[in-house]
C-alpha cells in the first residue's frame, strides 16, 4: 500500500473521500492484480503478456472516459459499450479495480485508528479454530442456542445501498451501481439468485467485499442495540469505523419497533448472551429462558425485512436446547453433554467419594456429510465404499500417493479437534483404499493383487497413523503424553474450511 500511495495520490483523495478518480488510474489495477495484470484475469485469453495486459487496461480506461453512461439503457445490453467485446475479461478487470479502490479508505482508517493505540495483535486469532476454545469455555454453562442463517440479498442493489452508509463518494457509488446493472443485463434482464451466484463466482473478491459490508452493517446495528443497556461496554469486537447517520437510523429503528418492544434496553439486557459467526452462519447462545430467545428471533427477522429489505422467515432461525441438540458449525457437530467424574475427598480420618458431572462440549466429525463430499469428489460411492479416482490414473505412482496423502493430512489437520477419532479413521480408510484402487486400475490389476506385488514400504508414509509418530520419536513416552497427543488439538494456522469439509 505504501508503494502505491504516491502514484494514487491517496492523501489528496482522502481529504474529500474521493474514490472516483482512482478508477481511471492504471496503478489501481496494478495494485489489484499484484504487479502482474495477467495473473488470473487472462486465463481465458492465452497469448497475452504483461505489456498486452497493460494495453487492455489502457483501452478500457479510455473507453470509460469516452462513454456517457446516462445515455445507455437496459435495452442496449446486447451492444454493451461498457464491457466491450470481451465481457468476462473486462468485468474481471473492473471488479478487481472497484474492490481494491473501495478498500483503500477502510485501510487508511484502520491504520490511523491503530496509530498510538497500544493494541496487541494476536495473529493466531485469525484461525477459525480459535473459536472452539471460546465455545468450550462458554457454551457448557448456557442453556439455549439459536442457529441463524443470515439471509442472502436478493438484489445487488441492496449491497450497494449498504455500502453507501460508509462510502461518501457519490460518483464512485453511481459508477459502481451502473457497473452492476450492466453486468446483470448482460446475463438477464431480470436479476435472479442465479445471476448473483454467477457474479460471485466470477468476481469473488469484489462480491466478498460487498457481502462483508452487508454483514458488517447488520452486526453494527445488532451489537449497538445489544450493548446499549451497558453503555457500549463491549470493546473486544474490534475497531468501529466511521459510519454515517448511525444514531439517526438507530432512533428510527427504535420507533419502528416501539409497539412490539416498548423498552428496548430491557429487551436486550442479557449478560449471559454470546454470539459467534462464520460467513453467513451464526450462533446466538444464552443462559436465559426460551421466551427471550424467541424475542430475539422475532427481532432479527424484522431487522432483515424492515431495515435491509431482505426477505426472511422464522424458519431461518432455529432455537434448540444445547443439552439435547447438536450444533452444525464450521463443519463440526458440537454438543453439550454431562461428563461424570468421581472425586475422592479426604477430611481428617474420614474419606468419601463425590460424584461430579460438569457439562462438556463435544466436537465430532460429521461423518455422513463428509462421506457425501467424498462421493461427490468420486473417492467413494454414496454409501462410503471406496472407488478408484479415474482422473488421476494417468499420473505417476508417486504423484498419486502424494496427492491422496495431501488430502488425508489436510482433513486430519482440520479435524484434529474432534473428541472421537473413530469417524476420522473411517475417512482415512476410504482415502487409502481409494488410492490403492486407483493404482491397481492404472496397473490393470486388483487391489489385493497389487498390494501383494508391491513392497509395503512404498506405502509406509501413507499408512502410518499420526498417533504412531510419537511412539517412533519417543519409544518410552509416558501414557499421559500419548493420551495428550491423541486428545483434541486446535491449530492456529487454519484460516478457512477444508474444501471437502465445506458441505454447507
Curated annotation (Swiss-Prot):
Entries under InterPro entries matching the protein: Domain_X (IPR024937), Maturase_MatK (IPR002866), Maturase_MatK_N (IPR024942)
A biological-process GO annotation: RNA splicing
Any single GO CC term annotated in Swiss-Prot or TrEMBL for this entry: chloroplast
Location in the cell: Plastid, Chloroplast
Keywords attached to this entry: Chloroplast, mRNA processing, Plastid, RNA-binding, tRNA processing
GO molecular function, one term: RNA binding
Protein family according to the UniProt entry: Belongs to the intron maturase 2 family. MatK subfamily.
Record function comment: Usually encoded in the trnK tRNA gene intron. Probably assists in splicing its own and other chloroplast group II introns.
The protein's name: Maturase K
Source organism (scientific name): Quercus palustris (Pin oak)
Amino acid at each position: 500500500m505504501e508503494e502505491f500511495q504516491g502514484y494514487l495520490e491517496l492523501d489528496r483523495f482522502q481529504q474529500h473521500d474521493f474514490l472516483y478518480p482512482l478508477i481511471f488510474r492504471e496503478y489501481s489495477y496494478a495494485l489489484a492484480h499484484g504487479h502482474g495484470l495477467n495473473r488470473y484475469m487472462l486465463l481465458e485469453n492465452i497469448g497475452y503478456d504483461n505489456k498486452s495486459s497493460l494495453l487492455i487496461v489502457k483501452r478500457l480506461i479510455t473507453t470509460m472516459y469516452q462513454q456517457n453512461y446516462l445515455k445507455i439503457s437496459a435495452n442496449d445490453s446486447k451492444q454493451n459499450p461498457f464491457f466491450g467485446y470481451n465481457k468476462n475479461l473486462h468485468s474481471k478487470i473492473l471488479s478487481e479495480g472497484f474492490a481494491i479502490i473501495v478498500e483503500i479508505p477502510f485501510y487508511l482508517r484502520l491504520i490511523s485508528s491503530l496509530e498510538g493505540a497500544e493494541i496487541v495483535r494476536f495473529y493466531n486469532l485469525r484461525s477459525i479454530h480459535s473459536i472452539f476454545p471460546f465455545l468450550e469455555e462458554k457454551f457448557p454453562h448456557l442453556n439455549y442456542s439459536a442457529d441463524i442463517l443470515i439471509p442472502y440479498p436478493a438484489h445487488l442493489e441492496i449491497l450497494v445501498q449498504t455500502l453507501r452508509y460508509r462510502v461518501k463518494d457519490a460518483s464512485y457509488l453511481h459508477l459502481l451501481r451502473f457497473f452492476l446493472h450492466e453486468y446483470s443485463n448482460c446475463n438477464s434482464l431480470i436479476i435472479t439468485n442465479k445471476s448473483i451466484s454467477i457474479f460471485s463466482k466470477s468476481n469473488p473478491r469484489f462480491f466478498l467485499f460487498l457481502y462483508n459490508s452487508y454483514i458488517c452493517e447488520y452486526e453494527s446495528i445488532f451489537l449497538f442495540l445489544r450493548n446499549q443497556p451497558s453503555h457500549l461496554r463491549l470493546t473486544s469486537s474490534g475497531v468501529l469505523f466511521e459510519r454515517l447517520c448511525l444514531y439517526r437510523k438507530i432512533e428510527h429503528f427504535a420507533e419502528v419497533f416501539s409497539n412490539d418492544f416498548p423498552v428496548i434496553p430491557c429487551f436486550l439486557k442479557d449478560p449471559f448472551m454470546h454470539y459467534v459467526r462464520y460467513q453467513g452462519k451464526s450462533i446466538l447462545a444464552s443462559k436465559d429462558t426460551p421466551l427471550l430467545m424467541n424475542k430475539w428471533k422475532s427481532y432479527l427477522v424484522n431487522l432483515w425485512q424492515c431495515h435491509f429489505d431482505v426477505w426472511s422467515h422464522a424458519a431461518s432461525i432455529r432455537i434448540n436446547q444445547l443439552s439435547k441438540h447438536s450444533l452444525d458449525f464450521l463443519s463440526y457437530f458440537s454438543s453439550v453433554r454431562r461428563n461424570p467424574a468421581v472425586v475422592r475427598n479426604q477430611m481428617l480420618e474420614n474419606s468419601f467419594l463425590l460424584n461430579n458431572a460438569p457439562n462438556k462440549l463435544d466436537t465430532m466429525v460429521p461423518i455422513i456429510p463428509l462421506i457425501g463430499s467424498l462421493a461427490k469428489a468420486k473417492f467413494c460411492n454414496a454409501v462410503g465404499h471406496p472407488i478408484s479416482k479415474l482422473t488421476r490414473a494417468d499420473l505417476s505412482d508417486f504423484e498419486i500417493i502424494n496427492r491422496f496423502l495431501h488430502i488425508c493430512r489436510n482433513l486430519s489437520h482440520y479435524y484434529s479437534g474432534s473428541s472421537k477419532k473413530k469417524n476420522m479413521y473411517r475417512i482415512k480408510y476410504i482415502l487409502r483404499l481409494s488410492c490403492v484402487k486407483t493404482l491397481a486400475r492404472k496397473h490393470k490389476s486388483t487391489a489385493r493383487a497389487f498390494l501383494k506385488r508391491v513392497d509395503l514400504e512404498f506405502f509406509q508414509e501413507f499408512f502410518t497413523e499420526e498417533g504412531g509418530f510419537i511412539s517412533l520419536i519417543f519409544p518410552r513416552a509416558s501414557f499421559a503424553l500419548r493420551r495428550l497427543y491423541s486428545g483434541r488439538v486446535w491449530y492456529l494456522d487454519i484460516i478457512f474450511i477444508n474444501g471437502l469439509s465445506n458441505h454447507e
